A protein has these predicted regions:
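N-terminal glycine-rich FAD/FM-binding segment characteristic of electron-transfer flavoproteins
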Residues: 1-128
């Protein structure tokens, strides 16, 4: 499948350090594929080499303003929030209820990405 470009994506699925390693990136790719979305990441993820810097979203990376921005395992540093501020709807999935991103989010799910995201993928596939 052709990957959706970050510049023109209506939906962006973005992953952070909460994914615990590059080997877990598959859930980001799979959710993006089901939604027809682009993938992105936080600066720490790019700095650790889990993803290319071209996918790094934020003040020091690429600013994005999709219709829907889904942040998975991203705590929400001010630099990251500045880069996604133009997003119409922000959905945050994080296991830390105190993550700053929840204050900036339109919708938030407090839960483990490794159980929430596969469940979301299953529900979305069932509706297709």
């Amino acid at each position: 499948t052709d990957k959706v470009s970050l510049d023109e994506a209506a939906i962006v699925v973005s992953g952070g350090r909460g994914l615990k390693g590059a080997e877990h990136w598959g859930i980001i790719e799979e959710l993006a594929e089901v939604l027809g979305a682009a993938t992105a990441c936080s600066k720490p993820v790019a700095d650790m080499g889990w993803r290319p810097h071209a996918e790094h979203v934020g003040q020091t990376g690429k600013p994005v303003a999709p219709n829907l921005y889904i942040a998975i395992g991203i705590s929400g540093a001010i630099q990251h929030l500045a880069g996604v501020n133009g997003s119409k709807v922000k959905l945050v999935i994080n296991n830390d209820p105190e993550a700053p991103f929840f204050k900036a989010a339109d919708y938030g799910v407090v839960g483990d990405a490794f159980s929430v995201v596969p469940e979301l993928i299953k529900k979305l596939k069932a509706r297709q």
